[in-house]
Amino acid sequence: MAKRQLNRRQNWRIEKIQGERAARAAKREQHALQELEGGDLGPEQLGLVIAHFGVQVEVEAQDGETAGQVFRCHLRANLPALVTGDRVVWRAGNQGIGVIVAQMPRSTELCRPNNHGQLKPVAANVDLIVIVFAPAPEPHPNLIDRYLVAAEHAGLRPLLLLNKADLINDENGPGLHALLEVYRELGYPLLEVSAHHGDGMQRLQQQLDGHISVFVGQSGVGKSSLVNSLLPDAGTRVGDLSEWSGQGTHTTTTARLYHFPNGGDLIDSPGIREFGLGHVSRDDVEDGFIEFRDLFGTCRFRDCKHDREPGCALLKALEEGRIKPQRMNSYRSIIASLAEDSY
């Protein structure tokens, strides 16, 4: 059954109610923070944000007698938006509650625009982005390519991960193998695993050890199952595919950071069906298509749009098979989705 469309007045009323609730929550949080800061606070110490719950976060103490312990912390109003993976300075209060007083500089951040077009960080201080897809829901090359552009833009190393490899059959196998071959030819690291059967999980663990990684991908591709297989004590809830849509049901509601026994961390983020790139420029997108890089600037016309123009280096490469149609379609789709002012 299709979702009922809301009219403008209904949308306005929903936003108004949500805004009022958010304002009341913020007022309660500010009152709690004032009471906390009015009492005795411990010395400043370093911490790591391991989960975010709206107006509060969970912080793991990084030094001192409480190192390794987790505290629920309030946020001072003058702080920038914090995300899982942020390193912070915090002070402990009473009853296991603390206050974050400063954010440490980020080495990297993975961002995406929200529904209002405002840039929203997803995870901080990550160095490996694991792009997860599966035979079902059907993988979309455009979404994979959007993640690859985001990885290049953020300076993160990508790892393509096909989960549920045990579901490959005669029907979906040819298309999947053709999809994977495109990225293998480009030199992207790629693994095939099955979190359910354990196939390939040891090789995946070796790739993750020593890195701060984030799993991204559509809902339903098995990110939570991967976390449960890698970290059995994590207890991440697993969801099924929606019967009517074939899309995954969301299970992870907030990004959470987990530690690996041999070193390294994993951030499990909520499922993302559409990954916007409105915060990047045309140059950033072009840089994200690694096989296109040497071709840009070699077209006959300086303002070539790589559509039907004569003397286009990209169209020639496409005709000669040096660029795959799948990648060209993704490039055109992403460029078309950019805001006019990013050109």
From Swiss-Prot:
Pfam families: RsgA_GTPase (PF03193). It is an enzyme of class 3 (hydrolase). Residues 116-275 form the CP-type G domain. GTP binds at N163, K164, A165, D166, G217, Q218, S219, G220, V221, G222, K223, S224, S225. Binds 1 zinc ion per subunit. Keywords: Cytoplasm, GTP-binding, Hydrolase, Metal-binding, Nucleotide-binding, Ribosome biogenesis, RNA-binding, rRNA-binding, Zinc. Its cofactor is Zn(2+). One of its GO terms (biological process) is ribosomal small subunit biogenesis. The keyword GTP-binding applies. It comes from the Bacteria. Coiled coil: none annotated. Its main location: cytoplasm. NCBIfam families: PRK12288.1 (NF008931), ribosome small subunit-dependent GTPase A (TIGR00157). PANTHER family: SMALL RIBOSOMAL SUBUNIT BIOGENESIS GTPASE RSGA (PTHR32120), SMALL RIBOSOMAL SUBUNIT BIOGENESIS GTPASE RSGA 1, MITOCHONDRIAL-RELATED (PTHR32120:SF11). HAMAP family: GTPase_RsgA. This is Small ribosomal subunit biogenesis GTPase RsgA. It comes from Pseudomonas putida (strain ATCC 47054 / DSM 6125 / CFBP 8728 / NCIMB 11950 / KT2440). The lineage of its organism: Bacteria, Pseudomonadati, Pseudomonadota, Gammaproteobacteria, Pseudomonadales.
